[in-house]
Amino acid sequence: MSDRIQPLDAIGPVPGSGQDSDEALNDPAKVDYKAGREYLSKKDYVQAAVCFHNALRGFEEQGNDQGVANAHDRIGDICMEREEFGKALDHYQRAFEICRKESDIFSLVALNKKKVLAYRKMGDLNLAMAVMMDILDHYTETRNPKGSVEVLEMIAEVYREKGENLKAADALRTIAGIHRNFGHKRKAEDFDKRALKAEQE
């Protein structure tokens, strides 16, 4: 038995024990990002914003584009909750540019949906419509009928907000046609009725 005492700073987890496997614990930007998500889930937007801004700076210093995009996306979400729609759009657009550079199609669509909501909240229905048409093109190209139906419903709503009821009816009839093609008779009839109602308003 030895009388020598091991220095405290030499004591750490046993290699391979799993205690040192979480690299996020060693990355302040990831720690801040994780804390921001926790605050956001509790609707503590001030603390969440502080954490995400700190994470953003850390990710930028590391050159971690994915982290930068994620932080901008979350900060945009906070701005939406605080009804700061212009700021939200700025953050979503920054995330969008990174995702476009990375050819991350799914993230691009998700960000576009958030941008549509921000434009609608700001009353900029023409820009909302332009972005929705891009989303619809994506769903058409990828043969995604569920996604197409979702965005066509949004398009119909915006046309109605703009007072363009005939165009809203066309979008609703397109949805009815999609449902009819998949044998969803009742849903097709429902959308046909909604189209007729939109025309008569």
Predicted regions and their residues:
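TPR/Sel1-like alpha-solenoid repeat signature
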Residues: 32-39, 51, 58, 68-79, ...
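Flexible helix-coil transition and linker loops at the boundaries of alpha-helical arrays
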Residues: 19-23, 59-65, 99-103, 140-143
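Long, contiguous interaction/recruitment modules in multidomain scaffold/adaptor proteins
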Residues: 1-27, 31
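Terminal, low-structured helical/coil segments at or just beyond the last alpha-helical repeat
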Residues: 2-9, 177-201
